[in-house]
A protein has these predicted regions:
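Helix-turn-helix
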Residues: 1-13
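Alpha-helical DNA-contacting segments of helix-turn-helix folds
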Residues: 15-22
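Hydrophobic alpha-helical connector segments
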Residues: 17, 28-55, 70-73
Length: 146
């Protein structure tokens, strides 16, 4: 415990460091993700972002007990995630594999909303998959349901 307090002035600073480490990991994953197509890479990363969102919920809520939403760690982290993921969305949109009428911010907000749902993966997984299916272009959805 003493080691923690030598490295961090208080609990808030420790929580900020943990949150930032998780953001670093999700940003790095955006650069390293692999997949057969741009849409597959985007979808794979969004699955990782979902897992990040579900796990960071606890750290974020505890951090909010020691600070508020105006803390720069939140806005700076969101900006970094958007910058890291934007190339994935642009590539998938340029390949005409995902809708062009949704922004990355809207997509991330959808994933965050699903990640906030309490439940086991067997419960939340189909909800996430339905959300991700909604990223397909409307013409692709119609032909797939056809």
């Amino acid at each position: 415990m003493a080691t923690l307090y030598r490295n961090f002035a208080g609990r808030r600073e420790l929580l900020e460091a943990l949150y930032t480490d998780e953001v670093n990991a999700v940003c790095s994953a955006a650069e390293a993700i692999s997949g057969e197509s741009p849409a597959a890479r985007l979808t794979a990363w969004l699955h990782q972002f979902f897992a990040f969102g579900a796990s960071k919920r606890h750290i974020a809520s505890e951090l909010l007990e020691h600070t508020d939403r105006s803390n720069p760690v939140f806005s700076e982290s969101r900006a970094r995630v958007i910058a890291a993921a934007r190339p994935l969305l642009v590539a998938a949109q340029n390949a005409q594999e995902v809708r062009e009428d949704l922004t990355l911010e809207q997509i991330l907000d959808m994933i965050i909303a699903v990640a906030a749902i309490h439940g086991e993966p067997g419960y939340t997984g189909p909800i996430l998959q339905t959300t991700l299916d909604g990223l397909r272009r409307p013409a692709d959805v119609g032909s797939a349901m056809g």
